[in-house]
Amino acid sequence: NLTGKITPGEHTFTLKIDNRNLLKLDTMASGYSVDTQGYWNGVIGRIELQYEEKEHIDSIQVYTDDKGITLKVVETSDVHSPFKTENATITVNVTSPKGDLLGEKIFEIKVFNSKQVDYFRYDISKIDYWDEFNPNLYTATVKYECNGHTDIKSVKFGMRTIKTENKKILLNNRQISLRGTIDCAIYPLTGYPPMDIEVWRKNFKTIKSYGLNHVRFHAWCPPDCAFNAADGKG
């Protein structure tokens, strides 16, 4: 956060990447070995400087159940005193996998902190569940209005329930078998994992063609585009 630290004019940002063995985990630690890309390089993907109003949405998380969704929204504001509050409005729209708008819900809230968490309930009457055969994706759009400023963010999600019963895993009340492969961050041609969603879509399509339904990323976390591709491929 560079708020109040930048003066008018041209600036240069410098990143220092330190790959020294600071943790002393020895060579047997998979996530810290020279065999995989997690240890080789510094920063991949996107680096950017964003301007946002003080009143904006910090993050959105969606929790699903068999009745609908609960949204966890983190809002930011210019409120820094417990004796000061701002009135704000949260508007939630949900779009179905077929592109139909399911309806709008409006919530009036009190903002009493510079960063606060609120939960909002949105019921869905007819649910198109997500699974490996039907990777249905909904879109939740949240609009935050506070102190004359407006911020809008969207997130895609799949409706599913997961539970266990007699040592069996149930997805949407149906037993599933986890059949997977492993990804150890080994990409020798580039020296880093792909940051293009189309590459991940192709990878998951190939993996799925062998009858598999999950990938375990061993000792590292893939980029956002990998998760988005996996959601869409089931």
Residue ranges and their predicted role:
Residues 1-218, 223-233:
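Secreted/periplasmic carbohydrate-active enzymes, especially glycoside hydrolases
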